[in-house]
Amino acid sequence: IRPASFWGIVGYKPSFGKISVAGVKSLAPTLDTLGSFGRCIEDVALGVAAMSGDHELANVVDLHNKPRVAVLKTPEWQYASPDTRGAIALARFSAETFAKGKVSDIDLPAELHQLTQIQTRIMLSEISRSLTFERMQYSKKLSNLITSQIDQGAAIEYKQYKLDLDQASTARNMM
């Protein structure tokens, strides 16, 4: 979870469906999943265990296996800030040096190079539908950014949205 890494805390994004989203206002239901933030792994594990009902998650144990980490530099890597590049380099160094782990570089298959655009269209399309009530009842209270996202999403044809969902599903299966 990006915010956790930026703030120096622990974040965990579980698999889709691990934690029920009942009662949550979702912006993009096919992309959103609930996770947890905390000051340490044990706190996050306890939170996810409580929210999911998977109480085994609360039993954090030390792993004695060396970590295996993969670095995937997508076509968007060229836009990464120097701070982001430095953080990735530091994480790689730490995994290799301190944890004696194996870090591999992997390439994104060419057929997945459009995932960022696909994800963006899915998100915008779903935002447009998810915020229909707010747009109809409280349009003047919505920020310019949200209004713009709603408008962009409304302009995406359902046929394109469905194609994007299919491509995202194919990509998940490839990974």
Regions found by a protein language model. Name each.
Residues 43-46, 87-90, 163-170, 174:
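A non-catalytic, amphipathic alpha-helix used as a structural packing/dimerization or gating element
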